Swiss-Prot record:
Gene3D superfamilies: Metal-dependent hydrolases (3.20.20.140). The lineage of its organism: Eukaryota, Metazoa, Chordata, Craniata, Vertebrata. It comes from Mus musculus. Induction: By streptozocin-induced diabetes. Repressed by low protein diet. This is 2-amino-3-carboxymuconate-6-semialdehyde decarboxylase. The gene is Acmsd. It holds the Pfam family Amidohydro_2. It is an enzyme of class 4 (lyase). Monomer.
Length: 336
């Protein structure tokens, strides 16, 4: 069994949001025919996507070809829209979540849903989380690595974490809103370097901000193998112990205490990196994640995990399925 915790999906179409809300900044989808569409933001091309980004039947065909049993579906992060008026973001979230729920309902043995929330308005976010879990049946939510000027340790977000604990709703943290200009303008650096940096900052903010202390039952997964965190934990812990006046302002506990307290996906593209990741984060906390259907994703799902001579069959099964089932709070028999 292979459960892919990190995949993205969009509706085939959605309303003209600029006309709907009266201001720009929104992403629109322009279908081009022949299984291709353009994501357009304020008249500029953001990304060209293929039919597998909106058509569940195409996805299932490709899943069957690659041996993937289940995909956890989440929106494309550019759709988060945390910058917008909260009620407008809520309306978009409801549209995206309803579309996602309809796809899961059609293929409940192949897909599970990770919803999206208006995180800039925590009260509305909690209400939509309740709906996602209780009405739509989602086991989790995808959130950004920061919410406008809030890092993930901001007390404004604590009601969301409290609700997630109460509802047993898992959180999948995805980097987004990287610097795109200046020194980052060339070489795809926002995706190659910016995303790992964003994820590392998100992990550090939750650790040093005491989030895992305040919400010990919170289940959190960080995308892209936790970014640079597994490689830099030595520097982070050393800095914490050398300069507690700077690093221990909100949490006196050594960052190493929290290794094993959160999950990451496996998307590191390198056997040495995957070995380090499982050594640092724990073999019980790393889950297969591919970033399907995008080019930076793992094109052969699970191939890297299966190639690891250091991993026994029990470990490989944990990484490809068992850990995801634990993270999502689901039983294997639902998908067998």
């Amino acid at each position: 069994m292979k459960i892919d915790i990190h995949t993205h999906i969009l509706p085939k179409e959605w309303p003209d949001l600029e006309k709907r809300f009266g201001y720009g900044g929104w992403v629109q989808l322009q279908q081009q025919g022949k299984g291709e569409a353009k994501m357009i933001k304020d008249g500029k091309l953001f990304r060209v996507i293929q039919q597998n980004c909106w058509d569940p039947e195409v996805r299932i065909r490709e899943m069957n070809q690659k041996g993937v049993t289940v995909q956890a579906l989440s929106t494309v992060p550019v759709m988060f829209s945390y910058w917008a008026k909260p009620k407008d973001t809520l309306e978009l979230c409801q549209f995206l979540n309803n579309d996602l729920a309809a796809t899961v309902a059609r293929y409940p043995r192949r897909f599970v849903g990770l919803g999206t929330l208006p995180m800039q308005a925590p009260e509305l976010a909690v209400e939509e989380m309740e709906r996602c879990v209780k009405a739509l049946g989602f086991p989790g939510i995808q959130i950004g690595s920061h919410i406008n000027t809030w890092d993930l340790n901001d007390p404004e977000l604590f009601p969301i974490y409290a609700a997630a604990e109460r509802l047993n709703c898992s959180l999948f943290v995805h980097p987004w809103d990287m610097q795109m200009d200046g020194r980052m303008a060339k070489y795809w650096l926002p995706w190659l370097v910016g995303m790992p940096s964003e994820t590392t900052m998100a992990i550090c903010s939750m650790i040093m901000g005491g989030v895992f202390e305040k919400f010990p039952k919170l289940k959190v997964c960080f995308a892209h193998g936790g970014g640079a965190f597994p490689f830099t934990i030595g520097r982070i812990a050393h800095g914490f112990n050398m300069r507690p006046d700077l690093c221990a302002q909100d949490n006196p506990s050594d960052p190493r205490k929290y290794l094993g307290s959160f999950y990451t996906d496996s998307l590191v593209h390198d056997p040495l990196s995957l070995k380090l990741l499982t050594d640092v984060i724990g073999k019980d906390k790393v889950m297969l994640g591919t970033d399907y259907p995008f080019p930076l994703g793992e094109q052969e799902p699970g191939k890297l995990i299966e190639s690891m001579a250091e991993f026994d069959e029990e470990t490989k099964d944990k990484l490809t399925a068992g850990n995801a089932l634990a993270f999502l709070g689901l039983e294997r028999k639902l998908f067998e």
